[in-house]
A protein has these predicted regions:
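Long, contiguous interaction/recruitment modules in multidomain scaffold/adaptor proteins
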Residues: 1-94
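Alpha-helical segment of the N-proximal tetratricopeptide repeat
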Residues: 79-131
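Register position in tetratricopeptide repeats
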Residues: 98, 131-132, 165, 195-198
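Conserved structural position within tetratricopeptide repeats
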Residues: 111-114, 143-147, 178-181
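Short coil turns that delineate tetratricopeptide repeat
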Residues: 116-117, 150, 184
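TPR alpha-solenoid repeat register
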Residues: 121-122, 155, 188-189
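Canonical tetratricopeptide repeat
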Residues: 124, 158, 192-195
């Protein structure tokens, strides 16, 4: 294998791991068979895959203009795909949640959960309700998420935080263990393990 093949191999490895990440971060969508939402979430990676495949053709062109146009088209494509990959209401809700405007986040997540009853939207609603101090409503939203997808670990994690805050240590410990055993991103699993040690 010559040195010219190294960038191509590295690019295809990047694409492979990017697709793995898409499916690991969106396992709930696969379990819910929400293929349209999954494709939408995968848009940046679809563009990245097209970019990698087109590299095989474009690298044969020596003209600088072709390479520049190719790069500009795909940078614009990735930016546009990234923008389109998340519904506007979800972006607004996430921004509101991060800045501590929980009322706005609750309203947006509630609308999302009503329009498309996915476990993630109910869990996000539960997190916003919990952050806003609405404990029972938060638990109800987390329960609804778990009805949609019993493997959605974030719902267990959110519910555990509410139980912990309400000093229901036994329930919190059970939900933290369930969160660890379920489909949960690594950073939340680590946080759940740490909280479980503190709770027991």
């Amino acid at each position: 294998m010559g040195t010219a093949a190294v960038p191509i191999v590295l690019t295809f490895l990047l694409v492979f791991f990017a697709w793995r990440m898409v499916f690991s971060m969106n396992g709930d969508l696969v379990r819910a068979r929400a293929w349209g939402v999954l494709v939408r979430k995968a848009l940046p990676f679809i563009v990245l895959t097209l970019m990698a495949l087109s590299m095989l053709v474009v690298r044969n062109f020596q003209e600088q203009g072709v390479l520049t146009a190719w790069a500009v088209i795909f940078v614009a494509g990735i930016l546009l795909a990234n923008l389109l990959s998340t519904p506007a209401a979800e972006r607004r809700a996430t921004k509101a949640f991060r800045r501590g405007d929980y009322e706005s986040a609750i309203a947006e997540y509630r609308t999302l959960a009503e329009e498309r009853p996915l476990a993630r939207y109910h869990a996000f609603l539960g997190a916003a309700l919990g952050a806003n101090g609405e404990s029972e409503e938060s638990i109800e939203a987390s329960n609804r998420a778990l009805e949609e997808d019993p493997q959605y670990g974030l719902a267990y994690y959110n519910r555990a935080l509410v139980h912990r805050r309400e000093n229901r240590r036994s329930r919190a410990a059970k939900d933290l263990q369930r969160a660890i055993d379920a489909d949960l991103p690594r950073r939340f699993k680590n946080a759940a393990r740490k909280l479980l040690e503190e709770t027991e």
